[in-house]
Amino acid sequence: AALCTLEAKNEKFPLYKDAKVPMEKRVEDLLSRMTMEEKVLQLSQYVAGRNTNANNIGEEVKNIPAEIGALLYYSTSPGLRNNIQKKAMEESRLGIPVLFGHDVIHGFRTVYPISIAQACSWNPTLVEKACGMAAREARLAGLDWTFSPVIVVARDPRWGRVSEGYGEDPYTNGVFAAASVKGYQGDNLADGKHIAACLKHYIGYGASEAGRDYVYT
């Protein structure tokens, strides 16, 4: 009887939800429970928050699958974010929370110089501090993740996204990208003051031809 009670308790509170268990074991347990469809949805991203009509917020939440992994989030509404997260936690089979991401590239509420101008400072320590402040502002707005820094080695000034990177020198790109990641993520992503970074874009993206975006890369 005691064994049955213990098994029933474990079923209600699975290992992957136990914060005292090492992260690797929690991830392994969670993955073992997931269906292929759930794994695919965790690798998918929807867009939310562009519809600012209050009457349509419910419709927007309804159209987002409860099992979605992440959102490109444009809203500043705590209500919309909380409703989406509530749906993910309560209506999905495994209760996996959603990651809310946004392009926090050169500041969030406080706007700093664009990345190529940051590189002109030759001051990665200052850039780290700026990214740290941007992370804090973004986290307070309910974001977990930024699609930054942009690491593109500029090869053609006609390309419209040159300004998003740190110039034409690979070493400079590396130094400032590292500083940015340190600023965004800090030493502890769970401290409520930092967000996850995302190095982008895919390898070779900056090697555009004739300045055209996406065409050959």
Where on the chain are the PLM-derived regions?
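Glycoside hydrolase catalytic-domain context in secreted enzymes
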Residues: 2-217
